[in-house]
């Protein structure tokens, strides 16, 4: 499987429209010394997408709030039974290390004996190597959309014309809402001295 590859490489599926800060993505990949880093995001059709489950460190382990390590511990294909899941979808944009390919070829058994060179990246390479602990999910709020159906293509085209694709890149300032622990949103009213001043 591509023995001439000696460096990590970026792989983009052809039906994805994306505008992300790739420097952040590359830094994440290097910091985790990953065999593969997968851009992940919530989408509008998780029922027909591969979902990623990542390791969560308990509050006892980290001394505070639960912490997501971003290490992928489970890969759910669209046909797998799903009782409960977080909408965290593999976007089809990955940084892949040659080590992942070498490890895959050590134990690779073709699922299609009639065509042994046919390899499915998700099912034959990424999913089987989760046990290595070196596959990571890079969550981003940036614009990532699978436009593999006519409806999704139209949505992506509309978003592009509205400027939404570019605007969501993290190199641009983003709008944010901060909530306190009970989820209350208060209007900024300066120094509040009694409850009647809250809006």
Regions found by a protein language model. Name each.
Residues 6-10, 17, 23-30, 41-46, ...:
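Catalytic-core segments of class I nucleotidyltransferases/pyrophosphorylases
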Residues 50-53:
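Extracellular disulfide-bonded cysteine-rich modules/repeats
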Residues 171-174:
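Short, small/polar residue-rich loop motifs at catalytic or cofactor-binding pockets
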Residues 13-14, 181:
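Short acidic donor-binding/metal-coordinating loop in glycosyltransferase active sites
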Residues 176-199:
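Alpha-helical substrate-recognition element adjacent to the catalytic core
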